[in-house]
């Protein structure tokens, strides 16, 4: 590829970004943009999957059937978020298995908040209310990110995270009564 051709592609790419036109999987994109998206989205996917673990441990110990059903739905949602995000990474040419292998080997990262134990039911409510609440604050902006599949996925994910936050808050209010 000639240098002028590359410069023209970069110019067109930047024009799309400047006009807030979403970049789609088949569009040309700079290698650094692609690499950054793969790293960011895979880290997000890993965080969704690892984030299920503390709550998943509480499904059989939830205080009542309603709380168990809500927690089961939440864990299922988080798994879906992770799978959706792994699919978004695949649209960038990354291999899902290699991405997961990077997580298992420690090469890839995830949100460190999930390294803390959830030893009481109040911890589960707090994860829902505060951790998911913080995630919403960070993720709402991603609904407007430049990469189309990620932006569209984030709209769905943020709606579900809002449900998780409400359930966490309700769980803690119930404990306080």
Locations of the language-model features?
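Acidic/His metal-coordination segments adjacent to aromatic residues that form catalytic metal sites
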Residues: 22-42, 102-128, 145
């Amino acid at each position: 590829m000639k240098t002028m051709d590359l410069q023209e592609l970069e110019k067109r790419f930047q024009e799309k970004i400047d006009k807030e036109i979403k970049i789609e999987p088949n569009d040309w994109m700079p290698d650094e943009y692609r690499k950054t998206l793969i790293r960011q989205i895979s880290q997000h996917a890993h965080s969704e999957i690892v984030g299920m673990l503390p709550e998943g441990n509480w499904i059989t110990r939830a205080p009542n059937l309603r709380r168990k059903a809500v927690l089961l739905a939440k864990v299922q949602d988080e798994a879906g978020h992770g799978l959706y995000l792994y699919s978004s990474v695949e649209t960038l040419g990354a291999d899902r298995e290699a991405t997961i292998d990077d997580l298992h080997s420690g090469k890839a990262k995830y949100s460190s908040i999930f390294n803390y134990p959830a030893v009481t039911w109040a911890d589960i409510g707090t994860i829902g209310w505060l951790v998911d609440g913080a995630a919403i604050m960070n993720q709402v902006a991603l609904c407007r990110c430049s990469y189309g599949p990620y932006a569209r996925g984030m709209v769905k994910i943020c709606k579900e995270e809002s449900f998780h936050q409400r359930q966490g808050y309700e769980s803690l209010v119930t404990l306080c009564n």
